[in-house]
Amino acid sequence: MAASISSRSLLDPKSLPDALKMLRDEGPLTPLAGCTDLYVSLNFGTLKESRFLNLWRLAALRGIGVRRNTLTIGALATHTDLIRSPLVRKRLPMLAAAAREIGGVQSQNRGTIGGNVANASPAGDTLPVLAAADAIVVLQSAAGTRRIPFTAFYTGYRQTVRQADELIVAFEIPPISGRQWFRKVGTRAAQAISKVVIAGVVGKQPRLAIGSVEPTVIRLPKTEESIARGVDVAESQRVLISEIAPIDDIRSTADYRRRVAANLLARMLSGD
């Protein structure tokens, strides 16, 4: 049964400072923007939050640019923005590839990278990309700004270090050297929740991150080190299998995830 929205309240800030002040003075509030996940929860009657902060019209959280040779992506950049951005396609093509895999066109037009990250689902398609890219999450409150390495942002299943008075305002991605790679495996070819999702960089400093396998997205430093040493593919696959602890859930089994992850690693290393 769909949940009623009549008992819920929505605050509508006109600027980022206004939003941060509301979080400080009128919280707790749940930030929202594209609402692609919120509406699903509302329709299924599982939405627990009752007070929301509308970020959708805050221009300060939009935009994609380069500052001091660092790619900066506003938290309200939509997946369509990521797909179309020449800067993203040039500097972080694996993020554009991930954005193409998220839902249908309507979800891509409304869903934001900040929402995908804040939702903290281990199956989020952009998460392995940001982990493999050594991205920085920029958090802001009325008291100031914090920059958190993406790999330190998640503390558990759907849990993050973001405080109640903070907003994700941007992501900072340093230059990447090497061939970037992204793949997602789901129940069907499109509009599917990931069973396994991998992003990586093949080069002098290999990088590999995997999602929808453990309670949070993870980097695989032992597998990265094996790739850097130049061992054969089978050995790197063995290292990967020993490094992950896949979960069983309604979407897949641990054994399936283990085998798929190893196969995807082989495809990444072969350039497929």
Regions found by a protein language model. Name each.
Residues 1-272:
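C-terminal structural segment of proteins
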